[in-house]
Amino acid sequence: MIVIKIGGSIVDGLHSSTISDLKNILKQDKVVLVHGGGKDVTIIGNKLGKEQKFIVSPGGVKSRYTDKETAEIYTMVMSGKINKTIVRLLLSNGISAAGISGIDGSTIEALRKKKLVVVNDKGRKMIIDGGYTGKINKINTLLIRNLIEGNFVPVVSPIALSEENEFLNIDGDRAAAYIAGGLSADKVIFITNVNGLILNDELVKEITYDKAKESLPNIGHGMEKKVMACIESLDMGVKEAIIASGDVENPVSSALFHTNCTVIRK
């Protein structure tokens, strides 16, 4: 089984061969898709008059601040517009697909973050309310497994259910990692807009789990999240984590053959 995470910035820019490539993969393996889409959330939120706010952690990681209204917009865009657009694309090309969110079937449960430590414009640390952002603490794979057994490709949006049954914004890369772990997947592939991890101006084609952990302080913040998700997936028993570009011919097969991408193993 393979779990594939499609980054939000790449959903509209996938290579034209992606669908035929996926159809060929499905002849021999089961696939689960997890998607992002933060850019669309920002655009639609602003159109609705809800300015999207971003915060920076002490480690320099930028993320969306999710208050209650933003959580509703996030849920609407992720599970409505983006998820169903991907499902429609798959169906129109002869791939049986079913779109769900992490809410459905309690697929992804998370603990709501009560407080967040952020850095303000003056570089000072502040503690603010955690809003509606979650840390994944449980994956229930029954619904996904039932869809797979029915020969559907599950397409999952990264929204989690809190302990108080609230919608929570969760990181899409980590959602893919946890789903891969929960399904005991053989591989998880993070399809993005770059070829993989760059260190010292060179593409890292293969790296061990231990070396990946050691390298985290030297990795740019966008890629750092993906490498952390790779590490977490390996911790949960996934055999191989791959970071690869979606803008190449047959991107999934290319990643599986380790062509011009980053492969992380224990």
Please tell me what each predicted stretch does.
Residues 2-62, 66-266:
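C-terminal catalytic "cap/lid" subdomain
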